Amino acid sequence: RDIRVVLDCGNAVPGPLAIKVLERLGVDVIPLYCDWDNSFPNHPPDPTRQENMEDLGRAVLEHGAEFGIGMDGDGDRLGVVDENGKFIHPDRLMGIFVEEVLSDLPENATEEQRTIFFDVKCSMALEEAIEELGGVPKMVRTGHTFMKKELREFPDSPMAGEMSGHFFMNDHWDGFDDSIYCAARLLSIIGMDPSPEQGGPKFSER
């Protein structure tokens, strides 16, 4: 279905490619600060800090988008604001990914296949959500180097993520923290439901 999003890349590297990929997927993309400028005149390209997502939030409201996507300087971190322009904390965003990842597993999935790694900065709510969805939560020291190490040692684990906005999708992807791929996965998840106008959930209700 049609989805409108605002995309803020903070004048950093991912901008032009991210627009091209999302538009190729049929997304109605409203670009914000997606042209390259290494002086970063609008805000630092860090989508996990609320102050860097304020312009994105205002643009979502202005354009009536379902949500807004922010990317960091080198395209390995993702941040989101909801339809009200409200910042979504990365561990809550990870919960949306986790629900889809675990629901795709077979009933006889092994413990390793159900293991989700997250860093110590994430909330207990994420750990509880993983358990409720039938997953096995495993807390890891903060740092994407440590997450990559866990995925090498547990190659059947479908996902790992951090409060910094690094999300490592390891089910249909190779375990890399790629913001463009993660944005595409998020849009796929959202697109499975009817639009809010047709009775589907708003982003803030997820």
How would you label these PLM feature ranges?
Residues 189-206:
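Gly/Pro-rich interdomain helix-loop hinge
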Residues 1-193:
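Phosphate-binding chemistry for phosphorylated carbohydrates and sugar-nucleotides
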